[in-house]
């Protein structure tokens, strides 16, 4: 997944993905609202993608460029992505399977009745914590968004000019996510 993520940035696919979402995202004037929404989306993905490293790299390929190009500081975007697996939840989680086995119950029952209520409450709380704490730190650090230097924030420069990368490339970064969900028990 690491090589795939790097290649997507190299060919400009991450930039093409942002261009697809650029118009709807212009209606969100506060980048920290987008940061909170991104945290909720990634927490939903945690249930389906139990691999910590895999999900982190997938989010770096898809979510990070969108957040940074929307005005979120790179450190705030990384803070949210780094916190994506703060709880090991879901029926695909090894810890949930072991806990359900020790408790003598079905893993889906354990997930729905014991993990999910706590998980939902924590996600709601941490969404607001991320929004306010990341905004506070960015203000303290003197973060100013400069759209001209977005590639500097992202840390890489694609081999293809961002404006020249075909919009069809936007589907490339999300292919692994679709494959993971399609071939899981959810599908």
Where are these regions (language model features)?
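Membrane-embedded alpha-helical segments and adjacent helix-loop junctions characteristic
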Residues: 1-65
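Structural signal for the C-terminal ends of transmembrane alpha-helices
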Residues: 8-11, 71, 132-133, 183-184
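Long, contiguous bundles of hydrophobic transmembrane helices that form the permeation core
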Residues: 112-187
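Alpha-helical transmembrane segments and, especially, the helix-loop junctions at the ends
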Residues: 42-58, 64, 69-114, 118, ...
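Hydrophobic, membrane-facing alpha-helical anchors
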Residues: 11-15, 32-34, 74-76, 139-154
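Short, amphipathic, aromatic/basic-enriched membrane-interface segments that mark the entry/exit
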Residues: 22-30, 83, 161-166
């Amino acid at each position: 997944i690491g090589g795939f993520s790097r290649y997507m940035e190299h060919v400009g696919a991450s930039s093409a993905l942002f261009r697809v979402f650029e118009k709807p995202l212009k209606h969100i004037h506060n980048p920290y609202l987008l940061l909170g929404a991104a945290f909720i989306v990634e927490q939903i993905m945690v249930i389906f993608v139990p691999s910590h490293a895999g999900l982190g790299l997938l989010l770096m390929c898809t979510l990070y460029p969108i957040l940074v190009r929307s005005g979120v500081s790179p450190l705030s975007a990384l803070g949210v992505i780094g916190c994506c697996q703060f709880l090991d939840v879901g029926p695909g989680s090894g810890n949930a399977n072991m806990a359900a086995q020790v408790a003598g119950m079905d893993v889906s029952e354990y997930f729905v009745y014991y993990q999910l209520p706590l998980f939902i409450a924590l996600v709601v709380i941490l969404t607001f914590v991320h929004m306010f704490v990341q905004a506070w730190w960015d203000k303290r650090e003197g973060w100013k968004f400069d759209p001209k230097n977005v590639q500097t924030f992202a840390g890489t420069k694609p081999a293809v000019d961002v404006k020249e990368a075909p919009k069809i490339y936007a589907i490339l970064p999300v292919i692994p996510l679709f494959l993971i969900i399609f071939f899981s028990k959810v599908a």
